[in-house]
C-alpha cells in the first residue's frame, strides 16, 4: 500500500500539485500520518480530512490573524463567506447589514476558480464594493473553505450522508477559523 500511495503522491508532484489533500476513514488516518499527511479536521466515525503540509492550515490561520485587529472584549465579530459570481447589490446589502451589526466583519471570498467570473475579478469587485466599510476585512478562502477540496463524497453511501458530511466538515474547519479570529456570528445569504 505504501508503494501505491507514494506513486500517487509523486504523480501529483509531477503535475505541479505540491499541496495535496485527502480524505480517509478514521481508522486509516494513522497510516496516512506515517506517509507525511497531517489532520485538518475529523468527523468522528466518518472521515478525516488531511494535507501533506505540516503547518498548512496553521499557516493559513496565522496569515488571517496577522492582517486584522484582535477582537476585544465586548466587540462583536462576524463572518460572511461568498462566491460573489459576480458581486451584486444583494451581496453588498448583506455585507453592509453585517457591518452595521458588528464591530468587525471577516468577508471570505471563495478562491477556487470554478465560477463564470474569475477569482481575481470577483475579489476586486468585492473589495471595491466594501471599500466604504472600514470594519470589513476581505480574505481568500484558499482550499480550506467552500472548495472542491472540502466537500467529500467518496466515503458516503447516499446523498443525505454527503450533505451531512459537507456541513459537518465545513463546521469543523470554520469553527477553527472562527476561534482564531474571534468570530461569534456567521451571516448567510441565498443566491437567486
Model-derived segments and spans:
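A conserved short alpha-helix in the GNAT/GCN5 acetyltransferase fold that borders
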Residues: 4-14, 33, 99
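Alpha-helical hinge/cap motifs
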Residues: 1-2, 90
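Short glycine/proline-centered loop/turn elements that form peptide/ligand docking sites
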Residues: 2-5, 26-30
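Short non-domain terminal segments
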Residues: 17-19, 29-30, 35
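Conserved GNAT acetyl-CoA-binding A-motif
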Residues: 12-25
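Nucleotidyltransferase catalytic core that binds NTPs
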Residues: 24, 32-37, 42-192
Amino acid at each position: 500500500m505504501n508503494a501505491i500511495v507514494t506513486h500517487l503522491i509523486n504523480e501529483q508532484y509531477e503535475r505541479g500539485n505540491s499541496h495535496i489533500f485527502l480524505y480517509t476513514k478514521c481508522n486509516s488516518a494513522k497510516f496516512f500520518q506515517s506517509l507525511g499527511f497531517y489532520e485538518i479536521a475529523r468527523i468522528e466515525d466518518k472521515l478525516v480530512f488531511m494535507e501533506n503540509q505540516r503547518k498548512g492550515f496553521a499557516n493559513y490561520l496565522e496569515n488571517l490573524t496577522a492582517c486584522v485587529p484582535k477582537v476585544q472584549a465586548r466587540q462583536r465579530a462576524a463572518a460572511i463567506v461568498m462566491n460573489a459570481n459576480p458581486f451584486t447589490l444583494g451581496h453588498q446589502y448583506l455585507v453592509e447589514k453585517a457591518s452595521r451589526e458588528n464591530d468587525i466583519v471577516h468577508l471570505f471570498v471563495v478562491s477556487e476558480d470554478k465560477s463564470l467570473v474569475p477569482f481575481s475579478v470577483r475579489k476586486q469587485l468585492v473589495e471595491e464594493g466594501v471599500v466604504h466599510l472600514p470594519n470589513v476585512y476581505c480574505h481568500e478562502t484558499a482550499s480550506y473553505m467552500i472548495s472542491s477540496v472540502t466537500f467529500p463524497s467518496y466515503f458516503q453511501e447516499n446523498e443525505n450522508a454527503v450533505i451531512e458530511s459537507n456541513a459537518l466538515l465545513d463546521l469543523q474547519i470554520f469553527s477553527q477559523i472562527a476561534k482564531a479570529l474571534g468570530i461569534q456570528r456567521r451571516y448567510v445569504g441565498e443566491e437567486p
